[in-house]
């Protein structure tokens, strides 16, 4: 029975052993999923740090790493989906999280030095990018920045970077300068452009600004500022003598010239007499060969102080003269002021074709001279002398549209110096007022003063018969 039971219940047939029964879950078996999550987060963090640390400041990928080697390419794990989890470790063994190989960025170093390594990596990258931008800015290399530059000349051969502390040691013309801080990070970049190279600062253009002033017109031209027609100045080392404009006033000089039998050369100008003298010499007809037609016509005419202020000028063809037995009268019908002004200028141009200014413009300049003299508290006799200087130059045809204001200002300045007791402060104030009123540079005025003096033939002391008519009219108007 026992044998039958033993034979009837044979054991299992020999064969391959089956898998062991699953073990009960323990704390060691739950460790691998957490380690996988931490490892996935570490991969993503490392990929993000690698991407951020390789961003260049100038938009270009860095060419060299901190140690001079090229940076490795981005890890393949950062571009591919995460790999399947590895097989579970055998039961009873502690779960380990091995550090991924090939995923460390150049900025990462072993534990304990990671923070310092990242700071050093960022500092080196910033310095390298700043130096690369500095070299590109100094050498003007990138062609993409040409449309943003200020138009300064570009030197393609200049690609060398200079670190300077004193800008006076280098010539910064036509160059670009980049300012960096102590850590060599960019602060500012600018160019040095030449202004007015080879030109005077006081030079102005005729077509520069057309502002409407009380006397109208455009600004002073640099070509006509320092010259008058018929006036020759000693330029470019040329010696010019103005002795012909001087006449002897000492008796000894007169006798000495007579003893040698030398006759004084006649003056080719408008004759003038000394103040208080009753002798009036005849006008001379000779004229300098260097003067033009307008100057010849003006020099042959004797100056009349009542010519330009004649009240008959505005009448023109609009007046009607009635002659009676005992008196004569003039009747002027009503006419528009613009037509009256036009007719006056045409009549004046027909009588004085060599004068380049209109009569209305001449009178406007004289009104400005009088207004300026009132502001500076000048005496009426000073204004009268300035009128004589100005009208002489006008009738000689030496004034033009470009130099009329400079001539008027120079006449006021000469009259103030010769007839009033102005000190240095008073002369400075007068020059400031002239510069403000006539809108020219004081350097041009001072340079033009001698030109006007030569054009007047150094005759600043005037006879009474030339000054008194203007003085009477001014005292009635003041």
UniProtKB/Swiss-Prot annotation:
Residues covered by region (Disordered): 1-121, 257-296
Basic residues compositional bias, start-end: 36-46
Function: Unknown. Probably involved in G1-S cell cycle transition.
Sequence similarity: Belongs to the cyclin family.
Protein name in the entry: CDK5 and ABL1 enzyme substrate 2
Modified residues (Phosphoserine): 130, 208
Pfam families in UniProt: Cyclin_N
InterPro entries: CABLES1/2, Cyclin-like_sf, Cyclin_N
CDD domains: CYCLIN_CABLES2
Keywords: Cell cycle, Cell division, Cyclin, Phosphoprotein
Species this chain originates from: Homo sapiens
């Amino acid at each position: 029975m026992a044998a039958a039971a033993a034979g009837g219940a044979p054991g299992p047939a020999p064969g391959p052993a089956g898998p062991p029964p699953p073990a009960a879950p323990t704390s060691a078996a739950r460790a691998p999923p957490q380690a996988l999550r931490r490892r996935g987060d570490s991969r993503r963090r490392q990929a993000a740090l690698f991407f951020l640390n390789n961003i260049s400041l100038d938009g270009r990928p860095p060419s060299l790493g901190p140690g001079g080697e090229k940076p490795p390419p981005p890890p393949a794990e950062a571009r591919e989906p995460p790999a399947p989890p590895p097989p579970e470790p055998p039961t009873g063994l502690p779960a380990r999280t091995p550090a991924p190989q090939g995923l460390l960025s150049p900025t990462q170093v072993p534990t304990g030095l990671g923070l310092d390594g990242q700071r050093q990596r960022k500092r080196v990258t910033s310095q390298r990018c700043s130096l690369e931008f500095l070299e590109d800015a100094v050498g003007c290399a990138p062609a993409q920045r040409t449309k943003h530059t200020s138009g300064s000349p570009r030197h393609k051969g200049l690609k060398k970077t200079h670190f300077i502390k004193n800008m006076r040691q280098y010539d910064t013309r036509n160059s670009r300068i980049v300012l960096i801080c102590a850590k060599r990070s960019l602060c500012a970049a600018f160019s040095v452009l030449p202004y007015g190279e080879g030109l005077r600062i006081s030079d102005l253009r005729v077509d520069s600004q057309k502002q409407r002033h009380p006397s109208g017109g455009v600004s002073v031209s640099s070509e006509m500022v320092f010259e008058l027609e018929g006036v020759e100045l000693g330029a470019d080392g040329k010696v010019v003598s103005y002795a012909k404009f001087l006449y002897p006033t000492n008796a000894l000089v007169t006798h000495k010239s007579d003893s040698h039998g030398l006759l004084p050369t006649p003056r080719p100008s408008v004759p003038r007499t000394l103040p208080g003298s009753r002798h009036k010499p005849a006008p001379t007809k000779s004229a300098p060969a260097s003067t033009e037609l307008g100057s010849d016509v003006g020099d042959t005419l004797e100056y009349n102080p009542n010519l330009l202020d004649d009240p008959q000028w505005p009448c023109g063809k609009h007046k009607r003269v009635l002659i009676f037995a005992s008196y004569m009268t003039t009747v002027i019908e009503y006419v528009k002021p613009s037509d009256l002004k036009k007719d006056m200028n045409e009549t004046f141009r027909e009588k004085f074709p060599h004068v380049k200014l209109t009569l209305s413009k001449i009178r406007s300049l004289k009104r400005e001279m009088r207004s300026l003299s009132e502001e500076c508290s000048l005496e009426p006799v000073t204004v009268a002398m300035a009128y004589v200087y100005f009208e002489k130059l006008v009738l000689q045809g030496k004034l033009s549209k470009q130099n009329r204001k400079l001539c008027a200002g120079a006449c006021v300045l000469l009259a103030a110096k010769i007839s009033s007791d102005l000190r240095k402060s008073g002369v400075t104030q007068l020059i400031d007022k002239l510069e403000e009123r006539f809108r020219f540079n004081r350097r041009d005025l001072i340079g033009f003063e001698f030109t006007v003096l030569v054009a007047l033939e150094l005759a600043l002391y005037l006879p009474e018969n030339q000054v008194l008519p203007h003085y009477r009219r001014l005292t009635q108007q003041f």
